[in-house]
Amino acid sequence: CLRLVYRVAGAGTKEFSALTAGDTIDALGPLGNGFPLLEGKKAFLIGGGIGIPPMLQLAKALNEINGSEMVQSVIGYRDSHMFLKEEFEAYGLVTVATEDGSVGTKGNVLDAIRENDLKADVIYACGPTPMLRALKAYSQEKGILCYLSLEEKMACGIGACLGCTCETKGGEGKSRIGLFMRSLLGDSMNTTSIQKVESNRFSRA
């Protein structure tokens, strides 16, 4: 069973929202590279907004490898509409932040981490660009490995059109997110890369 979670943000997702049971669509995937599954490390799985659903399968996989006590999901919502929260709870500990303070910590995921004095050895994150930028800075402050899943325009999805390039550090130039770098080691990214992604947030169909 394949479940798709999406936000209406462009022509493609608008067409998705008009589909009904029995309609047929063409699909290409999975594309790019996923997160590395590190053994023996306590992990923060951090999701915000539409970046929450991709973290659920990761929570399941890390639970199978390391056990639920090594999986700490930190999820950021706008309000008390906490989709998928109960499913995350099946695979580890869950801490919630809401923008309006209706549930959990009032604020963002970093506020929740600090308020609850949470600790981990590695960060996996997917969500809005300001969140990713803050998590990159936090990981450098704490000396924690950090993997960020970026949002970018995906025209072809396989890196051929070069529409999804992201600038990296160390003279490596640009990497094609659609082909190689769907999940990036946070320290390899230029700050300008994260800013570039922010300008294209939710623009993918």
Language model region names:
Residues 1-21:
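Ferredoxin-reductase
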Residues 21-24, 163:
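Residue-level marker of beta-strand positions
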Residues 25, 30-32, 49, 53-55:
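Extended interfacial segments that mediate partner engagement and assembly in macromolecular machines
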Residues 32-41:
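Short, Lys/Arg- and Gly-enriched loop/turn segments at beta-strand edges
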Residues 43-46:
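Conserved beta-strand elements of the Class I
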Residues 54-64:
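Histidine-anchored nucleotide/phosphate-binding helix
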Residues 66-70, 143-144:
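A short helix->loop->beta-strand "cap" motif at the edges of active sites that frequently abuts
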Residues 74-205:
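Reductase modules of NAD(P)H-dependent flavoproteins
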